[in-house]
Amino acid sequence: MSTPNPSADLLERLFKLSENKTSFRTEVLAGVTTFLTMCYIIIVNPLILSETGMDHGAVFVATCLAVAIGCLVMGLIANYPIALAPGMGLNAYFTYSVCLGMGVPWQTALAAVFISGLIFLAISFLKIREAIVNAIPMSLKFAIGGGIGLFLALVALKNSGIIVANPATLVGLGDIKQPTVLLSLLGFLMIVVMHHFRIRGAIIISILVITAISTFMGLNQFKGVVGEIPSLAPTFLQMDFEGLFTASLIGVIFVFFLVDLFDSTGTLVGVSHRAGLLVDGKLPRLKKALFADSTAIVAGAALGTSSTTPYIESASGVAAGGRTGLTAVVVACLFLACLFLAPLAQSVPGFATAPALLFVGVLMIQGITNIDWEDITEAVPAFLTIVFMPFAYSIADGIAMGFISYALIKLLTGKAKTVPYMVWIVAVLWAFKFAVFGG
């Protein structure tokens, strides 16, 4: 007669390992795999957000804690093998469009993220979420993802020095002979090759290798690997709600909300499909999964980071056998352990993380192949959405142009009845904003 194992019984009750045909060992391996593919965020996110004036160490801690909170809620309440972290694209929008582009203080931008999280939390328990998602044309959904990909690419090329400002042509090619530029190109090639051969952790490996090479060449100062946990005080509860509800910042809140809505829904369904967790094409416990996402957004903003969202890198853990929330809990524990790695994160230069941004841009733009380019009434709004994001240096303006042009072109071509009501509402609101308040 076997001796009862209280720990095993607890894990079975919490995560239903047997029912999901998995084991403790498999779930831990899946969690480690997911962690390796997404841990680059603890380096990239503080670098991006610190450009707004936010304290690097505090953002590092906020990033680790936001990931841990999101993953714990996802694992323990929703029981899905899906990890969450500050979204790439949303952090770039926060820094380069909202704070640096619009001149919004980072404290106010955090308040916008917080409000968007509360809105997301509210609709997580209502049926309007599906109505909103389904009301947005597929061409615009894919175009938004592709446009953000190009926006990230432009940021990456700028940060690496590959693209520089040029008074005559707006932008131009930088000095390719510069060591930092060459190292960025090397880092990008490393990621591409490792990704091709399905080497887990390709992005973080590239970042660490380029950091090591640059330190050896004297281009960067190495500050160590392990150290004390930085203070969270500089960003904790520093949200400033005064002046938040202006026309321009309401648009910012809308963009944070809309992009995360698409991101979370698409990732949750996509990863769950790969794991075989969908029932009749739908995701059981969807409300609990969205609750985890919105909780992470609200908590992250309070701690001091931009919007948190489910990570597509979770698919790597699913491929390794992850089927339950135990995978997400393992990811949470590993990110908490990373709190002691602040010196390493502070040692990484911007040109070492630029390849990661560029590669994420590659992944995000792949969805534009699903746009119906033969239908000009679908193609033009999608195209405008994509190109306005990098050229106007604003994700919000890209979304605005997409919605306005979609409604207008459908109206002028006699297809007004095919336009979802949500598109009309958003298009009119953006048009009013531009007409009254300008860009």
Question: Could you describe each region identified by the protein language model?
Answer:
Residues 32-39, 69-72, 76, 157, ...:
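Hydrophobic/aromatic residues within the transmembrane alpha-helices of Major Facilitator Superfamily
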Residues 2-58, 171-173, 204-287, 430-432:
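Helix-loop-helix hairpins and the membrane-proximal interhelical loops
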Residues 28, 48, 132, 201, ...:
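Residue-level signature of catalytic and energy-coupling elements of molecular machines
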Residues 53-72:
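Loop-to-helix transition at the N-terminal end of transmembrane alpha-helices
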Residues 7-45, 66, 87-145, 273-368:
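Helix-loop-helix junctions within the multi-pass membrane cores of secondary transporters/permeases
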Residues 102-216, 220, 329-439:
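Membrane-embedded alpha-helical modules
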Residues 68-88, 119:
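Juxtamembrane transmembrane-helix boundary signature
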Residues 47, 72, 76, 97, ...:
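Membrane-interface helix caps of multi-pass small-molecule transporters
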